[in-house]
Amino acid sequence: MTDQTSLQYTAEHEWVLIDGDVATVGITSYAADKLGDVVFVELPAVGDELAGGSVVGEIESTKSVGELFAPIDGTVTEVNDDVVASPDLVNSDPFGAGWLVKVRFEALPTLLSHDEYVALVGE
């Protein structure tokens, strides 16, 4: 499991782990809890160009369907096929095995710190 205090966050409940010019993206445990049991995940394809803030996939649960937003501009370099095959990883390990995509970026937008995200969700 990733140290959540070292991550950056979006107001759309996604976390971002920066490693050089690649960002690993997932949804937070707050979002996973609100969704309930995740049963389907649709992700962008490797090579897709993402525009920050745009809808790039969806996460379907027994309660609802949520949109997956691109937190940054960039190119998808890797998708987590394990999450597509076993969507429950989003619930069981959202900050680890439940990561969604890796994106190569040129410029990083302003994201929320851990403390700012905790204040946003009130947890």
From Swiss-Prot:
Gene Ontology CC terms, in alphabetical order: cytosol; glycine cleavage complex
Keywords on record: Lipoyl
List of residues that carry N6-lipoyllysine: 63
Primary role: The glycine cleavage system catalyzes the degradation of glycine. The H protein shuttles the methylamine group of glycine from the P protein to the T protein.
Assembly and oligomerization: The glycine cleavage system is composed of four proteins: P, T, L and H.
HAMAP family reported for this sequence: GcvH
Protein name: Glycine cleavage system H protein
InterPro entries: 2-oxoA_DH_lipoyl-BS, Biotin_lipoyl, GCV_H, GCV_H/Fam206, GCV_H_sub, Single_hybrid_motif
Cofactor(s) this protein requires: (R)-lipoate
Species assigned in the record: Clavibacter sepedonicus (Clavibacter michiganensis subsp. sepedonicus)
Residue ranges annotated for the Lipoyl-binding domain, each copy included: 22-104
Alphabetized Pfam families for the sequence: GCV_H
Gene Ontology terms: biological process: glycine decarboxylation via glycine cleavage system
NCBIfam families (UniProt xref): gcvH, PRK01202.1
Cofactor binding note from Swiss-Prot or TrEMBL: Binds 1 lipoyl cofactor covalently.
Lineage: superkingdom: Bacteria
Family that this chain belongs to: Belongs to the GcvH family.
